[in-house]
């Protein structure tokens, strides 16, 4: 599904090597890809949604910590607005293109059209 070469290229680009390759593969293959490609014989555990859930929380916490420290004169409302902007779908999509995640992520072509 995702070649070792592509994972290696991605790791080199972001400067991080994933210890658990199965986990990164699970995180990069959206279930819609399997349905779209009619690869129903290929079963992935439901890790994608679980990893998405966890990743959303980790990302929110990490960004909250950064803006809390950086904008020490801002009130809670201003910090919340900054956080909301930084974790919104459109902003994260731009980041994913910059990180070249789109070169390795597998998802339905129908899902791609919505982005």
Q: What are the roles of these predicted feature ranges?
A:
Residues 2-115:
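RNase III-family endoribonuclease catalytic core
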């Amino acid at each position: 599904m995702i070649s070792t070469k592509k994972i290696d290229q991605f790791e080199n680009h972001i400067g991080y090597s994933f210890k658990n390759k199965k986990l990164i593969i699970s995180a990069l293959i959206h279930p819609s890809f399997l349905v779209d490609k009619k690869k129903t014989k290929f079963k992935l555990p439901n890790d994608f949604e679980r990893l998405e859930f966890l990743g959303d929380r980790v990302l929110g916490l990490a960004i909250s910590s950064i803006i809390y420290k950086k904008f020490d004169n801002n009130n809670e409302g201003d910090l919340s607005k900054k956080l909301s902007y930084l974790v919104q779908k459109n902003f994260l999509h731009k980041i994913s293109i910059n990180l070249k995640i789109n070169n390795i992520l597998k998802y339905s072509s129908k899902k791609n059209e919505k982005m």
